[in-house]
């Protein structure tokens, strides 16, 4: 925003996923979008309301998209490591509670680094990320992802078809961790187990 002060810049994250097959597109669209600007910018809540007014989308206005996207990376990358470990077949992990616990540990390491660097944990529902309740909620979520086609649609399809993007995201978030003196040993171990996929 500081680079382009005359521009009104918004960032958005839509909850949708899918993949292309030879004769069709398989997708899921949860009709939910998180959208907003960087912290400190002029509010766009009214404009966003006008844009999405009359649509079936549930719109979550987020005035701090930088922290939201940092947290998203800290949640998504450990899940991507699981996708790479299994060559995209998350069902191989559906009963591996120990590994899924490590995925959660890596997410917590990421959130801790983000919080300790002075950023907010977003969404706010994740703010108590070191609690047993958070761990149980995440474990249920990851077990569901590994046991159903949701894992393929919402995680492994994207991870397996966006290796360059995931590799860049991993490099960038690790640079952030390093610049802020964060320890992330579980993250690094899962990354190593992801093998040949990450570049």
What residues fall within each predicted segment?
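Short, solvent-exposed polar/charged micro-motifs at secondary-structure junctions
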Residues: 19-23, 69-74, 133-135, 197-199
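Rossmann-like NAD(P)(H) cofactor-binding subdomain of soluble oxidoreductases
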Residues: 1-26
């Amino acid at each position: 925003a500081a680079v382009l002060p005359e521009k009104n810049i918004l960032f958005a994250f839509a909850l949708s996923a899918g993949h292309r097959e030879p004769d069709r597109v398989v997708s899921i669209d949860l009709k939910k979008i998180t959208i907003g600007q960087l912290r400190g910018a002029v509010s766009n809540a009214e404009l966003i309301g006008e844009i999405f007014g009359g649509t079936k989308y549930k719109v979550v206005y987020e005035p701090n998209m930088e922290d939201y996207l940092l947290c998203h990376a800290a949640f998504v990358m450990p899940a991507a490591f699981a996708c790479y470990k299994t060559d995209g077949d998350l069902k191989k992990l559906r009963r591996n509670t120990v590994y899924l616990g490590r995925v959660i540990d890596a997410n917590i390491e990421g959130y801790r680094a983000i919080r300790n660097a002075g950023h907010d944990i977003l969404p706010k529902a994740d703010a108590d990320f070191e609690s047993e309740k958070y761990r149980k909620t995440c474990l249920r979520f990851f077990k569901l992802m590994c046991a159903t086609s949701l894992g393929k649609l919402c995680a492994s399809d994207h991870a397996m078809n966006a290796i360059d993007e995931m590799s860049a995201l991993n490099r960038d978030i690790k640079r952030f961790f390093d610049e802020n003196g964060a320890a992330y040993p579980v993250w690094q171990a899962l990354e190593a187990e992801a093998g040949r996929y990450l570049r």
